[in-house]
Amino acid sequence: MAKTIAFDEEARRGLERGLNALADAVKVTLGPKGRNVVLEKKWGAPTITNDGVSIAKEIELEDPYEKIGAELVKEVAKKTDDVAGDGTTTATVLAQALVREGLRNMAAGANPLGLKRGIEKAVEAVTEHLLKEAKEVETKEQIAATAGISAGDPAIGELIAEAMDKVGKEGVITVEESNTFGLQLELTEGMRFDKGFISGYFATDAERQEAVLEDAYILLVSSKISTVKDLLPLLEKVIQSGKPLAIIAEDVEGEALSTLIVNKIRGTFKSVAIKAPGFGDRRKAMLQDMAILTGGQVISEEVGLSLETAGLELLGQARQVVVTKDETTIVDGAGSKEQIEGRVSQIRAEIESSDSDYDREKLQERLAKLAGGVAVIKAGAATEVELKERKHRIEDAVRNAKAAVEEGIVAGGGAALAQSGKVFETLNLEGDEATGANIVKVALDAPVKQIAINAGLEPGVVAEKVRNSPAGTGLNAATGVYEDLLAAGINDPVKVTRSALQNASSIAALFLTTEAVVADKPEKAGAPVDPTGGMGGMDF
């Protein structure tokens, strides 16, 4: 495909137009009085959202240079969302301000590499300042305030705080769509996975269609069980112990399954057969998690263990196993605390080293099942459009709350960034580096100005007042009052604030040092095809 090349000012201005087109669409959502954006979908109802990254992903521009400019800012929003789960609009607003100021200074003759070094040093200083100023999240109320601001709804914040209180900071909080109106919270203690019993005959409560095994043995097998002779020696030992047995295997079929069902119906022996969750390596890992949680071992040929020779010492144990047709919950496994902690550390290390969002999410789920618990927030709404928007807001707020617990909180409303300008007094920079640092100083006011604009206030006046207020004092845009924002429960996770600044400055610095852009040349539209195939004189 033919390429088109632009140089110097033309290249940078083309990129800036794309950046501005995207940023202008995103920044209207910032703050408590920010508006929503409607996104058209090719199929189904349109989506209404105030999430910066969702809006950014939908924007495709026609001009090749503008398209690249927009893609660069999309990267800022996406990276901030990946790291912190929120702050995508703030990151976009900061990137726009940094690029605008940077290009203005370059037009006045500043050297782009000097500006880049100055921007990097200034951002490093501001990041250190923010981390130092951050307050640890110690109370349920602080989590509720942080999540409530992210979701724009205090009720959602309180529900998330309650969920985190119950499952701990390592626990998984999932959001599901509900058929009923409003919000509900469901909590699960122990390990739950999405596989139920293989046959309904295993149910101990026919009305509720669930099997409940108290003080049960748990047999974990990595392969299929089909012949009863493999299982018989172990079954006899379990029957003698008088305890029920839960079998979790790749599958249980044939005469092995028939024998278990017949014994269950006759009341000879209480058992339940369950398919292991997941596939391939993930299934092996989850079985190993269960083994560590219950104090048993996975019977697998890979480690030289077989069913025929297995004894009771290889079985896991749990206070209770609850199985329905769709899911299984293991409560209070008998595994040793040290082994569980070791496994948790191992999974945490895998999360750190993984570069796949999907893998990270699955590892996080495994971690929660071992270390904390699972909370499910069920959200309902009057229409499908509202339901999607609400679910998205809750998911963002959950990630926001987790970020707050991780690194602490700073004053919200853009105040923490605007007041970080004081660190520039300690930076001894000269020439273009000092100019680069000043670009950052000016850009730090951009979020508070945009919040003021969206609230119908004068941005310059608000920014000036916030900048010169005591640390932590700023504008509560919802009420129009200047107050101690942390005391008023208006806070942002420092992880979100610093990620927004770091990612915005990274792209802005690259933007300013760009001297040429190579893009695909737009193809000329071909002549319309004659539907008659060139055959004239056709009458209908």
Swiss-Prot record:
Function summary: Together with its co-chaperonin GroES, plays an essential role in assisting protein folding. The GroEL-GroES system forms a nano-cage that allows encapsulation of the non-native substrate proteins and provides a physical environment optimized to promote and accelerate protein folding.
Main location: cytoplasm
Family (UniProt): Belongs to the chaperonin (HSP60) family.
CDD domains in UniProt: GroEL
Gene Ontology terms, MF aspect: ATP binding; ATP-dependent protein folding chaperone; isomerase activity; unfolded protein binding
GO cellular component, one term: cytoplasm
Top-level EC class: isomerase
Species assigned in the record: Tsukamurella paurometabola
Full protein name: Chaperonin GroEL
Amino acids binding ATP: 29-32, 86-90, 413, 476-478, 492
Keyword Transport: no
GO terms of biological process kind: protein refolding
Coiled-coil regions, chain positions: none
TM region(s), chain numbering: none
Record's subunit section: Forms a cylinder of 14 subunits composed of two heptameric rings stacked back-to-back. Interacts with the co-chaperonin GroES.
Keyword terms of this UniProt record: ATP-binding, Chaperone, Cytoplasm, Isomerase, Nucleotide-binding
Catalytic activity: ATP + H2O + a folded polypeptide = ADP + phosphate + an unfolded polypeptide
Cellular compartments annotated: Cytoplasm
